[in-house]
A protein has these predicted regions:
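Conserved short loop/turn motifs at secondary-structure junctions
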Residues: 31-37, 162, 270-274
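Extracytoplasmic
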Residues: 7, 32, 54, 71-73, ...
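Solvent-exposed, polar/charged alpha-helical surfaces in well-ordered, non-transmembrane soluble domains
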Residues: 6-14, 21, 47, 51, ...
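Conserved, well-ordered alpha-helix/loop/beta-strand core segments that scaffold catalytic motifs
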Residues: 34, 117-160
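Beta-lactam-recognizing serine transpeptidase/beta-lactamase-like catalytic domain environment
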Residues: 110-120, 167-207, 212-367
Length: 367
């Protein structure tokens, strides 16, 4: 039915944008009676094309996912492809719930593709997908994204991440990592912007891991907060030296001061002071599930890494005590700190709160 593919292609390109030669190739196909020229076109632009009354060009009503909050929470939500299938984020995690079942229409057609009067036809109505309610607080999410971006700029950092989680329930109220992504405009998305890195990437935590060592020591009962320990300015093992981040002389610290001063030397010696100290630290890291996946309902969760105990030298134990030579995801660390705030009960971080249509409220494991 297309009478002048070149002219029609140029007319379409003038309205929809893109390369006229691409449209011309589509309009010139001889091996098919149907081809999409543009899917999910803007409604106003489609109306302009319709006014052109082009031969052989027809219009099909379609649906597409809209993201009214744009970038805010975009990484968490994820995005769909042109067929409405979840590709990343919660769109992928809960695709089977959200997508429903597409309808079908089958009919006998003649040589020119026209329906045969009285021919066999079958129609199956579409079934809508379900809604889900998630834990994200959109105002807190926006605030968090702004703060992470500002902090990264102030520190000239290559990236940044942050998590806000309810320690008692595991509901994630806000979570963000640079660079951000707007699911309504994936053409401008940067590499890895579709990943929520506090979930998908492990990192070497550094001094925030000292709380893990301190909790181990307190649970083993080898030191109290006010016990004193001599802490040289530098300690050495296996040909390596360990010192604090700030220069100081030899000093004696209470265990409380070791944490307050964030002393690498102090926490190293405190761990080593336990009977089989490095073994105890290793066992407690395992006990706290710090290198294990949290079970969060988000695709692509990473595990942490910890060398097998048989490979530990003295310097390994020291390094691990202050968060080097070990890797965890930010969410794994948040879960650990959450357990400290939750009387030792560890929860499962999650986004899904309920399924309104069915009234289902999921339950999550605690330990």
């Amino acid at each position: 039915e297309v009478t002048d593919a070149a002219a029609e292609a140029q007319a379409i390109a003038n309205v929809l944008g893109g390369d006229a030669s691409t449209y011309r190739e589509l309009l010139s196909k001889e091996s098919t009676t149907f081809v999409y020229v543009k899917r999910q076109a803007d409604v106003d632009a489609a109306a302009e094309v319709k006014k052109l009354a082009l031969d052989g060009v027809y219009f099909i009503a379609d649906t597409r996912r809209e993201y009214p909050c744009g970038q805010i929470g975009g990484q968490v939500i994820g995005y769909c492809n042109v067929d409405g299938e979840g590709i990343t984020g919660l769109e992928l995690q809960y695709n089977d719930i959200l997508s429903g079942t597409p309808g079908t229409y089958t009919a006998e057609r003649g040589e020119k593709g026209l329906p045969i009067p009285g021919g066999v036809k079958e129609e199956t109505p579409a079934v809508d997908g379900q809604d889900i309610m998630i834990s994200i607080d959109i105002e807190l999410q926006e605030y968090l994204e702004n703060r992470v971006a500002e902090a990264a700029e102030d520190m000239t950092a290559a990236g940044g991440s942050s998590v806000v989680m309810d320690a008692g329930t595991g509901e994630i109220y806000a979570i963000a990592s640079l660079p951000y992504m707007d699911p309504s405009d994936m053409t401008s998305a940067k590499s890895s912007s579709d990943q929520v890195k506090p979930i998908t990437q492990a990192f070497e935590p550094g001094s925030v891991f000292k709380t893990v060592s301190a909790t181990t020591i307190l649970e083993e009962g080898t030191m109290t907060p006010d016990d004193m320990l001599f802490c040289p300015a530098v300690i050495e093992a296996d040909g390596y030296k360990v010192s604090d981040a700030h220069e100081r002389s030899d000093q004696t610290f209470s265990f409380r001061q070791i944490l307050d001063q964030s002393s690498n030397v102090g926490i190293s010696l405190s761990v080593q002071k336990m009977t089989d100290g490095f073994t105890k630290l290793y066992e407690h890291i395992q006990k706290y599930n710090l290198c294990e996946k949290t079970g969060v309902d988000y695709p692509g969760e990473a595990s942490g890494t910890l060398q097998p105990l048989e490979n530990w030298a003295t310097i390994t134990g020291w390094n691990v005590s202050f968060g080097q030579g070990v890797a965890v995801t930010p969410l794994q660390l948040v879960r650990f700190y959450g357990a400290l705030a939750n009387d030792g009960v560890e929860v499962t971080p999650h986004f899904l709160v309920s399924k309104p249509q069915t009234g289902e409220v999921p339950t999550y494991d605690t330990e």
